[in-house]
Regions:
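Polar, enzyme-active/binding microenvironments
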Residues: 1-182
Length: 182
């Protein structure tokens, strides 16, 4: 296997290489027993969330960032997702877009309250369904840019859209990337 199930860490206040200790069951693995390929990450600074996974999964796991150990079950996504884009503030984490093997690129945005476990809820929709999209956020907005789709026809997007994380609703178009990319 060229991928493993391990959590790699490096203290954020120090320079150096990650500690590649063998903590079991993680997030970025593929291969015969892969669970997490293209997961989406969110954090409130204390808790880190991992959403989605290989072949369109509904995984929703978390870790406590300040300690080592295995991930724990947080809940489930509403739909199975691979290669979505993650945004968060100190309260909410959301995943937008993505795909699963049986459907075209998704426009769905799902969210959770980071401090409490539970299943994801519907936030709204992206302006364009796509996967492999970039995502950034601050304390008020979550933005998704670019991305691609494969079904029914392949495309690459230059769309940039955003949501206000404090309230639910559909994303708004806020411009375009200089070129379409994923």
């Amino acid at each position: 296997d060229k991928y493993s199930k391990s959590i790699d860490m490096a203290p954020l206040r120090s320079l150096g290489n990650p500690d590649f200790s063998p903590y079991d069951d993680v997030f970025c693995s593929t291969g015969a027993d892969a669970e997490y390929v293209y997961p989406t990450f969110q954090s409130n600074g204390e808790r880190g969330l991992f959403m989605g996974g290989n072949n369109g999964e509904n995984y929703l796991d978390y870790i406590t960032i300040s300690s080592t150990g295995n991930a724990s079950d947080f809940g489930n996504l509403q739909t199975d997702i691979t290669a979505g884009g993650g945004v968060s503030n100190k309260v909410r984490g959301a995943i937008g877009g993505g795909f699963n093997p049986s459907t075209m690129a998704q426009n769905v945005i799902q969210y959770v309250t980071i401090a409490t476990t539970g299943n994801a809820q519907d936030f709204g929709d992206l302006t364009v369904g796509r996967d492999r999209l970039g995502a950034v956020s601050n304390l008020s907005r979550g933005c998704w840019g670019g991305g691609s789709g494969r079904n029914p026809g392949a495309f690459t997007s230059n769309t940039v859209d955003y949501v206000t994380l404090a309230s639910t609703g559909n994303a708004q178009d806020c411009g375009d990337l200089t070129v379409a990319r994923e």
